[in-house]
């Protein structure tokens, strides 16, 4: 089962070829592989990591906007990072060993992967692809009919956007062939946004430093998303490939989605190839309830790693949310209109889930209270010093860095139009949301999900449009790019990365530098490519929804709240409280009765778009794993795990391959979420 997959010639025979291949000098140092020390966060690992981060940001932006193909960096699954990491281990690392006698060791590979998953949270749905259209979109889509010129434009801070109509028109409709991007017009708002988002990233990393030991050492959260990269990064002295890639079950699992997606991809070019229909949608109760029954292979593979109670909780509460929302529609009853980013759930379902997330964060902070108090006391020099040598930042830096970054962020938000109190409420709500989603990703390993109610939307719900005023409502809308469509963000990806760093024993302080460089390089490279593509093709001609639906949805939301203020949404807050109470009861049952079969963490996910797309795949994985454990036991689970990990690689590998083919062939195949 674990036989050598392939045997290569000896590296010593052709090592001199490496001198002719400059790229592989990053690997080679003339030292035989057996004598190369474990480097960890080495200069060559960081250099290769930055190259991969740049390739990831350029490839994701071009693939989504121009090719209109599969999004590979839109969720915590970080498909782009996995594909690049897979190629690095399958092709580039063995080739480097062949040519130079040296290869990246497991710790260096971990460094590269951590940098990539952090970078994957930035270029598309994470931030930049959402931000660029906002720099001029509220002006481009203003019409006499929507009257944004009078209701919104006077309240937009000048330093947040570009008001030059020619520059905006060229961003959305394209410039003349060969005309360069007028960076002097765009640098002012871009600089303001970059300073702000870096402060947000830094503050969340500081929070993560303060919580890491509690989550990893005290509570021992599982971090299932770290499993596949750790398996890929395992090395044996005499083996060219890791054990996972020498297991035939891995390649059988790989072949299932790879062949099926390959046939569908060929069908898009050659009609004589059959099309395998994977989509299935069932409606009942007068079309008030709809079930999306499409299996997604990458979700099935990743969900196999979840514990049965967690996967049961995810699909069970999703199914209950479907029924709840459907019955409300059937009866024609609702506590209010649908809200951005919460649909297809009704507002009552969304706010119950949001209340559950609030309790999840409260319970997490409460269980960590002694550790957090000790961290703060140690940071201010009033308590017993705590060993923080394993953290990417010292506790003193984390505590005071969080405070400084928070002050900067709140002041920045207040300058956009929010009052100081509203800015503080909104900022803390975002931090709570980040902690909640990072906890879900770390504990449950679920790679897909967003906040049940977006922080800007909940701020309006809790404070009311009258308190916020037109300037505050406009400011909240302008902050949609980083705080509304939270399909991925840096904190959760870094949490997975820190687990990988703990297992591989990376040098923590040097890792922080690598992460910071990855963030900076990705921000710059993704901004450059998206601006360049927008001027070359015209934003409205590109894929994604940033230049179209996102900007228009946000403008309509701002205008509606300004022109039709409804006060504090009382029933929404009541359902939020009900969700917190239900989560508390389920948490008590789970802790009081060890055999309680459903994990309440699924309640905090609600029924947002990602959950509506993956719940059935989670159900399939839960059913398969339950049957395997029942009849094969733990041995059967371990035996078949490579099959499911291979399925993840095959799904993302096929998506990446067809993205490259479509970039040349002109068609658009979308295989990811």
Where do the language-model regions lie?
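Membrane-embedded transmembrane-helix bundle of lipid-linked glycan/lipid transferases
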Residues: 33-35, 45, 344-347, 516-520, ...
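Catalytic alpha/beta core of large soluble enzyme barrels
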Residues: 556, 561-644, 657, 663-664, ...
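Transmembrane-helix bundle segments that line or gate the permeation/cavity pathway
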Residues: 47-403, 408-480, 487-488, 526-547, ...
């Amino acid at each position: 089962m674990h036989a050598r997959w392939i045997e290569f010639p000896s590296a010593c025979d052709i090592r001199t070829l490496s001198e002719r291949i400059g790229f592989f000098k990053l690997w080679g140092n003339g030292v035989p592989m057996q004598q190369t020390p474990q480097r960890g966060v080495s200069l060559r690992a960081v250099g290769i990591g930055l190259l991969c981060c740049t390739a990831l940001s350029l490839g994701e932006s071009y693939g989504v906007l121009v090719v209109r193909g599969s999004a590979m960096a839109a969720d915590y699954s970080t498909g782009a990072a996995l594909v690049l990491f897979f190629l690095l281990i399958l092709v580039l690392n063995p080739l480097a060993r062949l040519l130079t006698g040296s290869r990246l060791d497991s710790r260096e590979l971990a460094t590269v992967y951590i940098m990539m998953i952090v970078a994957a949270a930035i270029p598309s749905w994470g931030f930049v692809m959402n931000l660029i259209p906002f720099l001029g979109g509220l002006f481009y889509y203003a019409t006499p009919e929507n009257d944004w010129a009078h209701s919104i434009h006077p309240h937009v801070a000048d330093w947040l956007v570009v008001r030059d109509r020619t520059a905006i028109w060229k961003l959305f409709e394209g410039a003349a062939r060969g005309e360069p991007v007028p960076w002097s017009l765009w640098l002012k708002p871009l600089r303001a946004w970059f300073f702000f988002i870096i402060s947000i990233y830094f503050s969340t990393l500081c929070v993560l430093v303060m919580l890491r030991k509690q989550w990893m050492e005290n509570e021992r959260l599982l971090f299932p998303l770290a499993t596949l990269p750790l398996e890929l990064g395992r090395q044996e002295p005499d083996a060219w490939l890791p054990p996972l890639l020498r297991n035939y079950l891995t390649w059988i699992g790989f072949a299932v989605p790879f062949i099926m997606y390959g046939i569908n991809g060929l069908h898009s070019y050659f009609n004589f190839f059959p099309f395998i229909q994977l989509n299935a949608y069932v409606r009942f109760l007068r079309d008030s309830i709809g079930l999306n029954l499409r299996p997604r292979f990458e979700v099935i593979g990743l969900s196999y790693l979840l514990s049965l109670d967690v996967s049961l909780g995810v699909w069970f509460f999703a199914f209950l949310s479907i029924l709840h929302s459907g019955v409300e529609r059937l009866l024609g009853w609702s506590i209010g209109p649908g809200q951005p980013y919460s649909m297809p759930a009704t507002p009552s379902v969304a706010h119950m889930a949001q209340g559950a997330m609030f309790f999840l964060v409260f319970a997490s902070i409460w269980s960590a209270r002694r550790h957090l108090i000790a961290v703060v006391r140690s940071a201010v020099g009033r308590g017993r010093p705590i060993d923080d040598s394993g953290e990417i930042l010292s506790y003193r830096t984390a505590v005071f860095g969080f405070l400084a970054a928070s002050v900067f962020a709140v002041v920045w938000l207040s300058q956009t139009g929010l009052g100081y109190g509203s800015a503080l409420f909104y900022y803390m709500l975002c931090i709570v949301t980040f902690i909640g989603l990072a906890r879900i990703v770390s504990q449950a390993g679920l790679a897909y999900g967003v906040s049940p109610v977006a922080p800007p939307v909940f701020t309006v719900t809790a404070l009311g449009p009258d308190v916020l005023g037109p300037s505050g409502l406009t400011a909240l809308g302008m902050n949609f790019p980083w705080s509304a469509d939270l399909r991925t963000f840096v904190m959760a990806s870094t949490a997975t990365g820190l687990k990988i760093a703990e297992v591989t024993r990376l040098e923590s302080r040097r890792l922080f530098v690598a992460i910071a460089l990855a963030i900076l390089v990705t921000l710059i490279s993704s901004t450059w490519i998206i601006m360049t593509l927008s001027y070359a093709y015209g934003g409205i001609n590109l894929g994604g929804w940033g230049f179209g639906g996102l900007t228009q949805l946000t403008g309509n939301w701002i205008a509606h709240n300004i022109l039709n203020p409804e006060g504090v949404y009382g029933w929404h807050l009541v359902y939020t409280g009900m969700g917190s109470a239900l989560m508390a009861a389920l948490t008590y049952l789970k802790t009081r009765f060890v055999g309680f079969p459903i994990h309440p963490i699924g309640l905090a996910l609600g029924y947002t778009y990602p959950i509506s797309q993956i719940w059935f795949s989670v159900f399939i994985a839960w059913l398969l794993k339950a049957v395997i454990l029942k009849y094969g036991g733990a041995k059967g689970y371990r035996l078949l795990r490579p099959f499911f990990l291979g399925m993840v690689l095959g799904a993302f590998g096929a998506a990446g391959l067809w993205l490259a083919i479509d970039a040349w062939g002109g068609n658009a195949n979308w295989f990811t979420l």
